[in-house]
Amino acid sequence: MQPGLWLLLATQLAALRGSSVLQQAPGSVMVQTNGMVIMSCEAKTSPTSTRIYWLRHRQAPSPDSHYECLAYWDPIKGIVYGQEVEPEKLTVFPDATRSILNLTSVKPADSGIYFCMTVGSPELTFGKGTRLSVVDVLPTNSQPTKKPTPRKKMCRPPSPVTQKGPSCGLLTLGLLVAGVLVLLVSLGVAIHLYRLKRRARLRLLKQFYK
């Protein structure tokens, strides 16, 4: 089997199960364009002289997957870069049993899954991978602004008009009193007329019988 194909198959298996020997962090990270990213890979059981390689995969694992060897740290040579890697954007340095990968001025094209790897004899050991997403605008967690619900206008009945003047009770009482007075006056007039007629009749009778 060709070494390139062997590395491809081994890395695909690493994407599925990873390794507890190499502890990689963070699991995923999202940054804005031109931002900076720091990843770490710690070898738990390997000696401090073990080389830790950094690989990148730009898309989800598939039969046509292409993995790039980015860089590794050599105690004598220092940072050893892979092909087509921009040294000004990528730095690797050791920290005891860890390897630190520092990416600067990242672009959306740098998005992908980053793996750390150690080479044994003959096995390859991989970290679980760090998924990097580079976006132009970071998503916000703020909730969308809700338009206030317009309040319904309540139709109020017109206020009763207060009429100034005497109350109904007083008005009715006044009418009754006026009616009684009219009746009394009418009765007095009728009695007076009756008396006048009676007197006139008596006078006529007296004149007739003389």
Swiss-Prot record:
Family annotation (CDD domains): IgV_CD8_beta
GO terms classed as biological process: adaptive immune response; regulation of immune response
Location(s) in or outside the cell: Cell membrane
Disulfide bonds listed in the record: 41-116
Entries under InterPro entries matching the protein: CD8B, Ig-like_dom, Ig-like_dom_sf, Ig-like_fold, Ig_sub, Ig_V-set
Gene3D superfamilies named in the record: Immunoglobulins (2.60.40.10)
Main location: membrane
Modifications the protein undergoes after translation, according to the UniProt entry: Phosphorylated as a consequence of T-cell activation. Palmitoylated at the cytoplasmic tail and thereby targets the heterodimer CD8A/CD8B to lipid rafts unlike CD8A homodimers.
Record field: transmembrane: 171-191
Matches recorded under SUPFAM superfamilies: Immunoglobulin (SSF48726)
Keywords: Adaptive immunity, Cell membrane, Disulfide bond, Glycoprotein, Immunity, Immunoglobulin domain, Lipoprotein, Membrane, Palmitate, Signal, Transmembrane, Transmembrane helix
GO cellular component: cell surface; plasma membrane
GO molecular function annotation: coreceptor activity; MHC class I protein binding
Coiled coil: none
Residue span of region Disordered: 139-161
Topology of the protein relative to the lipid bilayer: Single-pass type I membrane protein
Cleaved signal peptide residues: 1-21
Positions annotated as glycosylated: 102
Cytoplasmic side: 192-210
General function of this protein: Integral membrane glycoprotein that plays an essential role in the immune response and serves multiple functions in responses against both external and internal offenses. In T-cells, functions primarily as a coreceptor for MHC class I molecule:peptide complex. The antigens presented by class I peptides are derived from cytosolic proteins while class II derived from extracellular proteins. Interacts simultaneously with the T-cell receptor (TCR) and the MHC class I proteins presented by antigen presenting cells (APCs). In turn, recruits the Src kinase LCK to the vicinity of the TCR-CD3 complex.
Quaternary structure note: Forms disulfide-linked heterodimers with CD8A at the cell surface. Interacts with CD3D; this interaction couples TCR-CD3 with CD8. Interacts with LCK.
Name the UniProt record assigns to this protein: T-cell surface glycoprotein CD8 beta chain
Origin species: Felis catus
